[in-house]
C-alpha cells in the first residue's frame, strides 16, 4: 500500500487503552481506535487524554488508525 492511499485527519484523544492504543474522536465526530507510529514510539513521544493528534486512516478499515503527529 502506498503512502498516498492514507487519509489524514485531525482528532482528540478520548481515552488511553492498553498496549499504547487510544480512542480518538475525529473532527467529523467518528470515534476510532489508533496506535502510535513507530517513530513516535522510538522517540518516546507521550500522548495524554485531551491531546490534539493527526491520525492516518486506511481506506480499507476506517475504524482503526495510526497516530503520526501530536500537536502542541
Swiss-Prot record:
What keywords are assigned to this protein?
Cytoplasm, Initiation factor, Protein biosynthesis, RNA-binding, rRNA-binding
Please report the name of this protein according to its UniProt entry. Translation initiation factor IF-1
List the disulfide bonds in this chain. Answer: none
As for subcellular location, the record says: Cytoplasm
What Gene Ontology cellular component terms go with this record?
A: cytosol
Q: Which InterPro entries match?
A: NA-bd_OB-fold, RNA-binding_domain_S1_IF1, S1_domain, TIF_IF1
**Briefly, what is this protein's role?**
One of the essential components for the initiation of protein synthesis. Stabilizes the binding of IF-2 and IF-3 on the 30S subunit to which N-formylmethionyl-tRNA(fMet) subsequently binds. Helps modulate mRNA selection, yielding the 30S pre-initiation complex (PIC). Upon addition of the 50S ribosomal subunit IF-1, IF-2 and IF-3 are released leaving the mature 70S translation initiation complex.
Q: Name one Pfam family in it.
A: eIF-1a
According to its UniProt entry, this protein's organism is Shewanella loihica (strain ATCC BAA-1088 / PV-4)
Q: Which Gene Ontology MF annotations are present?
A: ribosome binding; rRNA binding; translation initiation factor activity
Which gene is this protein's source?
infA
Amino acid at each position: 500500500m502506498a503512502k498516498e492511499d492514507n487519509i489524514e485527519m485531525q482528532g482528540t484523544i478520548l481515552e488511553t487503552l492498553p498496549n499504547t492504543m487510544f480512542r480518538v474522536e475525529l473532527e467529523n465526530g467518528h470515534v476510532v481506535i489508533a496506535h502510535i507510529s513507530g517513530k513516535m514510539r522510538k522517540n518516546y513521544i507521550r500522548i495524554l487524554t485531551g491531546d490534539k493528534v493527526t491520525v492516518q486512516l486506511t481506506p480499507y478499515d476506517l475504524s482503526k488508525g495510526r497516530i503520526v503527529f501530536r500537536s502542541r
